[in-house]
Design a protein with these regions (language model features):
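Glycine- and aromatic-enriched membrane insertion/assembly motifs of diderm outer-membrane
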Residues: 61-123, 136-138, 267
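Outer-envelope beta-barrel architecture signal
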Residues: 36-42, 81-85, 138, 152-156, ...
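Extracellular loop and loop/strand-boundary signature of outer-membrane beta-barrel proteins
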Residues: 54-62, 125-131, 183-190, 246-251
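Predominantly the C-terminal beta-signal and adjacent terminal strand-loop region
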Residues: 195-200, 205-267
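Residues on the lipid-exposed face of transmembrane beta-strands in outer-membrane beta-barrel proteins
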Residues: 44-48, 69-77, 89-91, 140-146, ...
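Short glycine/proline- and aromatic-enriched beta-strand/turn motifs that initiate or cap beta-hairpins
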Residues: 34-76, 253, 258-260, 264-267
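Flexible, surface-exposed loop regions and adjacent strand-edge segments
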Residues: 58-63, 102-111, 173-182, 231-240
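Short sequence motifs at beta-strands and strand-loop junctions characteristic
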Residues: 63-68, 130-137, 188-197, 251-257
């Protein structure tokens, strides 16, 4: 309990530090651009994320999602009268979800786990093991935004496509069986660092003044790259052979999908 509390406290401190860094960056850029005739606009987003994962292997079943947060700087670069390019720099926290592995095996052979027995042998993880993936990314999204004419103070928009380059900064996993639960295990070495997300979204910009606008929208993005290394194996019990497990290399494809409630402000 004490260990988990300390881990949560450290994570909160890191999160607060990153929020402050992003805030300072946005304010510095805004101050600089105020003297440049606002060639482009910048802002800040803090957007809740409903994240889930899926797998092309029928024996690896999605078993719940995660509630996360995207936090970072956004920019709007005019292109034509009713369209613009967008560019950002985000931290994405707690993306991922949970898989139920109907067939156990050694799925985390390279991770820095607290108990070596969790990655020793052909089948350290039993049938029905659940692994919750908690992923933190540094993201660089770029998109093309189309706007309607302003009606009152509101302007509606469609942003598509949105292509996001993502780099894994942190990977944690909760391992759950009938006999034990291991939380916040370091599983980054069994995960793929780069990813690419393809998405789109729509929403509304509400002008509070000539230069300041609130933004609210709904976005969806899908990861195009398998986020697991696939260095592990599944193991089916077979008492007629020695050793008593029939192993198969894990070649499944696991991807992330995010539904994002985009909340931001442009200056």
């Amino acid at each position: 309990m004490v260990k988990n509390s300390l881990s949560i406290f450290k994570l909160m401190k890191r999160t607060i530090a990153k929020i402050l860094c992003v805030g300072v960056l946005v304010m510095t850029l805004q101050s600089y651009l105020s003297g440049q005739n606002n060639v482009f606009r910048i802002g800040f987003q803090a957007s809740p994320v409903f994240s889930g994962i899926r797998n092309n292997n029928d024996l690896i079943v999605k078993n719940g999602g995660s509630l996360g947060l995207k936090l970072g700087a956004i920019s709007d670069i005019p292109w034509k009268e009713h369209s613009s390019f967008t560019l950002g720099l985000n931290f994405a926290f707690h993306e991922g979800g949970q898989f139920l592995y109907e067939v156990g095996g050694n799925y985390l052979p390279n991770s820095d786990l607290s108990d070596p027995l969790l990655q020793t042998g052909d089948k350290p993880l039993p049938d029905g093991v659940k692994i919750r993936y908690q992923l933190q990314y540094l993201e660089i999204p770029a998109g093309l935004k189309f706007r309607t004419n302003e009606k009152g103070n509101a302007t509606y928009f469609l942003e598509a496509p949105v292509i996001t380059l993502a780099f894994l900064m942190r990977g944690r996993g909760d391992i759950e069986t009938e006999d034990y639960i291991k939380e916040q295990e370091n599983i980054k070495k069994d995960l793929v660092v780069p990813n690419i997300f393809l998405g789109l979204g729509a929403g509304v910009e509400y002008a509070m003044s000539q230069n300041n606008s609130l933004i609210a929208g709904l976005y969806f993005q899908r990861g195009l790259i398998d986020f697991t290394q696939d260095h592990g194996n599944s193991a089916v019990h077979n008492p007629d052979i020695i050793p008593t497990y029939l192993t198969e290399q894990d070649d499944s494809r696991a991807t992330i999908g995010n539904l994002i409630l985009f909340l931001g402000i442009l200056f």
